[in-house]
């Protein structure tokens, strides 16, 4: 019985004893999610610096922001780095990733976001199951697509949003004026949904709001 794994045993010390050690070697820990200071001063600093450079270049190539002079009337949001060390099952490093984010928890309603326009639809699992069943019954192929840097494809919207420049790449007296929906913003999910909805509609698809607004159908 599955429940006995957690109710009858100490998972960390009993159940795991018979699991292959390689499975546990890749277990996430705080060292695999370092802060900027920890990443730049740790044993993997070269790799993290390379990932940060790659992230900034990607965002600049996508025209995510303008660098402008700071003024006293701006609500400048803090920014942060989210680093991640991905490992192979044996614990060795597979990939180092850095993502530049905005501190959306510091946004102010009516200033840099609208609290009435931040809900983003999420696909129902019933819809996913139905499509998979239909693909099997009808002998159709299914494809899964992953958007690279998904949110930052979407325009920021009407409100001005400012944030601090990335640690390691700052310019004195300057801030970023966002043009795209950087990760961390409260409105980023709905902005991306509206963006991809427009793209799908342009390609001839229509959203089925009656069943699932995340279900798009083409004639």
Q: What is the role of each PLM region?
A:
Residues 1-219:
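Long, low-complexity, charge-biased intrinsically disordered regions
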């Amino acid at each position: 019985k599955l429940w006995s794994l957690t109710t009858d045993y100490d998972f960390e010390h009993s159940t795991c004893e018979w699991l292959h050690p390689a499975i546990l070697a890749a277990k996430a820990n705080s060292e695999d999610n370092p802060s900027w200071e920890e990443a730049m001063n740790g044993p993997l600093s070269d790799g993290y610096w390379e990932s940060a450079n790659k992230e900034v270049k990607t965002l600049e190539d996508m025209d995510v922001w303008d660098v402008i002079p700071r003024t006293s009337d701006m609500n400048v949001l803090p920014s942060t780095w989210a680093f991640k060390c991905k490992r192979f099952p044996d614990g060795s490093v597979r990939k180092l990733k850095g993502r530049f984010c905005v501190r959306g928890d510091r946004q102010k309603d009516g200033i840099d976001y609208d609290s009435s326009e931040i809900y983003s639809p999420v696909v129902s699992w019933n819809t996913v199951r139905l499509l998979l069943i239909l693909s099997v019954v009808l002998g159709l192929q299914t494809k899964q697509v992953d958007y690279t840097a998904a949110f930052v494809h979407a325009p920021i919207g009407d409100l001005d949003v400012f944030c601090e420049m990335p640690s390691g790449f700052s310019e004195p007296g300057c801030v970023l004026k966002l043009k795209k929906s950087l990760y961390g913003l409260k409105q980023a999910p709905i902005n991306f949904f509206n963006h991809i909805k427009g793209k799908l509609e342009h390609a001839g698809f229509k959203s089925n709001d009656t069943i699932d607004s995340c279900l798009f159908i083409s004639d």
